[in-house]
């Protein structure tokens, strides 16, 4: 989250991958959005911007679980371990739901390549 939006580098990468329109790298590829920020609501606004961008790119979005993680020192260790049991459980549940979402999308909108 940068000033309640997505980082410029991420936006630039999405812009490049979104061409040509209609046959871009995101078309029919399921997406889920997770974010963290030191403030309590910064990631929520940034995620809404990202959802709008991905919708324009024709990427089906999982909206049933929204993931707003308040980042605090020590939440993630140097080796990538999530120290909070509740956060780890939430992320595991989120990924299980996302896996099911991918399967549902692939049933309705099979990817051609």
Language-model segment annotations:
Residues 1-58:
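Helix-loop-strand module that forms the ligand-binding subsite of alpha/beta enzymes
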Residues 60-113:
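Glycine-rich phosphate/pyrophosphate-binding loop and the adjoining helix
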């Amino acid at each position: 989250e940068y000033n309640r939006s997505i980082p410029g580098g991420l936006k630039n990468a999405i812009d490049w991958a979104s061409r040509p329109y209609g046959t871009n790298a995101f078309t029919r590829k399921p997406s889920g959005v997770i974010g963290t920020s030191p403030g309590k609501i910064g990631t929520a606004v940034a995620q809404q911007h990202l959802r709008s961008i991905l919708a324009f790119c024709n990427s089906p979005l999982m909206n049933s679980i929204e993931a707003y993680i308040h980042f605090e020192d020590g939440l993630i260790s140097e080796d990538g371990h999530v120290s909070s049991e509740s956060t780890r459980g939430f992320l595991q549940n989120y990924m299980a739901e996302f896996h099911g979402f991918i399967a549902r999308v692939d049933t309705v909108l099979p990817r051609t390549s």
